[in-house]
Amino acid sequence: MGSQLALKSRIRSTESLAKIFNAQEMIASSHIAKARDVALNAKPYTDAIFDAVQALVAHTHITHPIAVKDEKNPRVAVLALTSDRGMAGPYTSSIIRETESLLSRLDAAGKQPELFVYGRRGSTYYKYRNRDIAATWEGDTDQPGVEIAETISNTLMDAYMKPAEKGGVSELYIVYTEFINMVVQKVRVLRMLPVEIVKNETKVPDPDEEAPATADVAPLYTFEPSLEKVLDAILPKYIQSRIHECLLTAAASETASRQNAMHTATDNARNLIDDLTRKLNASRQASITQELTEIIGSADALTKKEE
């Protein structure tokens, strides 16, 4: 009887958990479409800013910090985008694992990484392990706004533009989760600064071949009032747009990961309920069989006594 009461108690508690998991899954399902659309809609603007920066840097020969790394400064900024809440499967643990790997590689290369963390789960993880954190931000990791992107970008830009002797950094990395689809989300490491120029491969012309009628010619730019001032103006927009895009795709990934995790948890809870119900029914059947056996045995004993 005691085992049956314990099984009933476990079934009730598991049913309550299943309801919670299912509710979390439904909430995530209602948010994922919007999160995905917001992330996709932000990408064209970010790509346009990045193309503009690439064009500025590729077609000029300058020593602006946006394009040139200070080789004498070993300090490097690393921004990890984690989550505020749990119940998202391996989302935060994957980010932390990749961040730890990046920090190890930077240490091995003789760098001095400075850690910046967005998300309560990540900051709690590193604070518990007494890891020095340059700055942390929390709140709305599943629905980040422009304000938090601006706050983070201002902090990182100040660190990047600050001279080395005053604690500035020479590189800026960001670790985030890219939303591919509802099933696949991949952890990425992006070196945001200095800007890496992607050079197109050019084919060596064959003198025997006729030259094409049209050819890709690098456009000529005129910068007003000056190239340096244009770069100074576009740098904050570049950093903020890249960080905002990473925040949005990370939010979509977090929501998708939470939906998948809650769907799996709901299925596991229901399977556990079925298993516990079978055990309860078997226990009841055993109790009934034992009671019937005792009744039949007692009846046989009374019959023999009367004879």
Swiss-Prot record:
<dbReference type="GO" id="GO:0045259">
    <property type="term" value="C:proton-transporting ATP synthase complex"/>
</dbReference>
<keyword id="KW-0406">Ion transport</keyword>
<comment type="function">
    <text>Produces ATP from ADP in the presence of a proton gradient across the membrane. The gamma chain is believed to be important in regulating ATPase activity and the flow of protons through the CF(0) complex.</text>
</comment>
<dbReference type="GO" id="GO:0005886">
    <property type="term" value="C:plasma membrane"/>
</dbReference>
<dbReference type="GO" id="GO:0005524">
    <property type="term" value="F:ATP binding"/>
</dbReference>
<keyword id="KW-0375">Hydrogen ion transport</keyword>
<dbReference type="GO" id="GO:0046933">
    <property type="term" value="F:proton-transporting ATP synthase activity, rotational mechanism"/>
</dbReference>
<keyword id="KW-0066">ATP synthesis</keyword>
<dbReference type="Pfam" id="PF00231">
    <property type="entry name" value="ATP-synt"/>
</dbReference>
<protein>
    <recommendedName>
        <fullName>ATP synthase gamma chain</fullName>
    </recommendedName>
</protein>
<dbReference type="InterPro" id="IPR035968">
    <property type="entry name" value="ATP_synth_F1_ATPase_gsu"/>
</dbReference>
<comment type="subunit">
    <text>F-type ATPases have 2 components, CF(1) - the catalytic core - and CF(0) - the membrane proton channel. CF(1) has five subunits: alpha(3), beta(3), gamma(1), delta(1), epsilon(1). CF(0) has three main subunits: a, b and c.</text>
</comment>
<keyword id="KW-1003">Cell membrane</keyword>
<comment type="similarity">
    <text>Belongs to the ATPase gamma chain family.</text>
</comment>
<keyword id="KW-0139">CF(1)</keyword>
<dbReference type="InterPro" id="IPR000131">
    <property type="entry name" value="ATP_synth_F1_gsu"/>
</dbReference>
<dbReference type="GO" id="GO:0042777">
    <property type="term" value="P:proton motive force-driven plasma membrane ATP synthesis"/>
</dbReference>
<keyword id="KW-0813">Transport</keyword>
<keyword id="KW-0472">Membrane</keyword>
